C-alpha cells in the first residue's frame, strides 16, 4: 500500500420509517479482456462488426470443435491481478457452467469456479473528500461472454448475434466491503482506471465492455461489525443481485432504490427474497428477474476439453517487471515531484493520456504547478466546452509549455497569456513568434510605466485623495494603467510603482 493517510468513510445510513439502516454492497465486475482474439478461438473481438461475422466454429458450439486457450487472455488476467496487488495462482482450471439460453450455443459457459487464475487482492478507493476505503478483492477468474439476443427488431421474433460469444471476460469479485452508492461507483471507476493504465480492458461501459452485477443488502447499525468479527454473513441481511449495470450513475440509483425497497419490506414485517433483479432507468426502479441461483443450480464440473492451466513464476515475474506505473503511484509521485495538490494530482492521473500530456508540459516548461494550472483550468476547460478530450487537443504540450515559459520570463502577463492561448488553440503557431509578430510582449520598461502612472495620478486628484484614505482603492490606478498600456504592462511593476507614487503624494 502507498503511504497515504485517509480517513475511512462512514457507512451510508438510510432512515427507515421505524429505524436506521446501513448498506452493504459487493460487486462482480465483468471486464472484457483487451485482446484481438477470443478466449478459446481466433475469431475477432472487434466491436460493431456485422452480426454473426466474428464467429468461429468453436464459438458456435459446432460438434467436434475443441477450445484452444488464448495465451494473451491469460497474460492480461495476470496483469490485472498484479495491478490489484493480488495473488497469482500458478495452477488454475476451467469449469463448465451449464444453463440454456438462445445466445449460448454450447449450452454451457466455460468459467473458473473452483480454481481461479487470480486470488485475493485489494484496491484503494478514494472518494474525493479526504476519505478512502480499501476494498478487498476475493478473486478474478476468466470466462466466456455470451452472445446477444435482440428482441426489438421484429414484433414476432427475436434475433441472436453471436459476435460476442466466446469473448474473454475477467470477473472481478469484491468482498462486501462497500458501504454506499457513491463508494460503489467510485470502486468501479477505480477498477476501470487501473485496467486502462494496464491496457487490460478499455472500460467502455457504453459498449458493454465493463458491466457490474451489484449485490445489495441492508443491516441494522452494529451488525456489520458483528460480521467483521465472526465472518458470519447472516449479519448482513439477505442480498439481492442487480444484473448487468453499465453506467456509474445507474449503479448509484439502483442501489438507492433497492436499499429502500428492502427496508420497506422488512419494516412491514416481511422478509427479503434472495433473487436476481434488473434496474429500469426509465422508471428508476428494480424489478424481479428470477430467483437467485446457487452454484449447484448450474451443475458445475471441470471442463473435460481443457487441461488445468499451469503457468510459471518466471513468466509472471516478467509480466510484473513490465507493468506500467499505476494510478496511485503516479499520483503520489506528482504530489511529491511537482508539488501538486491532492485534487490536481487526481485530475491529472485520472487517465493515462492526461498524465502523459501534463508530464510533457511540466518537463518542458520546468514548472509543475504552473503546468497543472494551465492544463486543468485552461486546456481541460476549453476542451470540455467542445466535448473533446485531451487526444483531440489542438494545443500540443510543446505549445502550452511555450506559453508558460513566456509567463515565467515576464515576457507576457497572465491576461495576455490567456489571449495567446486562445490564438494558439484556434489558429495554431509558435507562441513566442505570435507574441513577437502581434506586439503582445509585456511592457517591463519601468520608465514607460512611471510615465503612465504619473499621467493618471495627475489627471485624477480626487481619486488620489480617496486612495490615500483607503489604500485598497489603489487598485483603480493599477486598472487604469493596464488599460492605458493595452494590458501589456507588467502587473507586478505597475503595483509597485502605483504604491510608491501614491505614498509620495
Curated annotation (Swiss-Prot):
SUPFAM superfamilies linked: GatB/YqeY motif (SSF89095), Glutamine synthetase/guanido kinase (SSF55931)
* Enzyme class at the top of the EC tree: ligase
Q: Which GO terms describe its biological process?
A: glutaminyl-tRNAGln biosynthesis via transamidation; translation
Q: Where along the sequence do coiled-coil regions lie?
A: none
SMART domains, per database record? GatB_Yqey
Could you tell me the keywords of this UniProt record? ATP-binding, Ligase, Nucleotide-binding, Protein biosynthesis
Gene3D superfamilies, per database record:
1.10.10.410, GatB domain, N-terminal subdomain
Superkingdom in the source lineage = Bacteria
Q: Name one Pfam family in it.
A: GatB_N
Keyword Ubl conjugation part of the UniProt annotation: no
The record's GO molecular-function terms, alphabetically, read: asparaginyl-tRNA synthase (glutamine-hydrolyzing) activity; ATP binding; glutaminyl-tRNA synthase (glutamine-hydrolyzing) activity
Mind telling me which PROSITE patterns this protein's record contains? GATB (PS01234)
User: Does the keyword Protein biosynthesis belong to this entry?
Assistant: yes
Reaction it catalyzes: L-glutamyl-tRNA(Gln) + L-glutamine + ATP + H2O = L-glutaminyl-tRNA(Gln) + L-glutamate + ADP + phosphate + H(+); L-aspartyl-tRNA(Asn) + L-glutamine + ATP + H2O = L-asparaginyl-tRNA(Asn) + L-glutamate + ADP + phosphate + 2 H(+)
Q: Span of the secretion signal?
A: none
Question: What EC numbers are recorded for this enzyme?
Answer: 6.3.5.-
Return the HAMAP family for the record.
GatB (MF_00121)
> What the protein does?
Allows the formation of correctly charged Asn-tRNA(Asn) or Gln-tRNA(Gln) through the transamidation of misacylated Asp-tRNA(Asn) or Glu-tRNA(Gln) in organisms which lack either or both of asparaginyl-tRNA or glutaminyl-tRNA synthetases. The reaction takes place in the presence of glutamine and ATP through an activated phospho-Asp-tRNA(Asn) or phospho-Glu-tRNA(Gln).
Q: Which NCBIfam families match?
A: gatB, PRK05477.1-2, PRK05477.1-4, PRK05477.1-5
Describe the family membership recorded for this protein in Swiss-Prot or TrEMBL: Belongs to the GatB/GatE family. GatB subfamily.
How it assembles, according to the record, is: Heterotrimer of A, B and C subunits.
What name is this protein filed under?
Aspartyl/glutamyl-tRNA(Asn/Gln) amidotransferase subunit B
Task: Give me the gene this protein comes from.
Answer: gatB
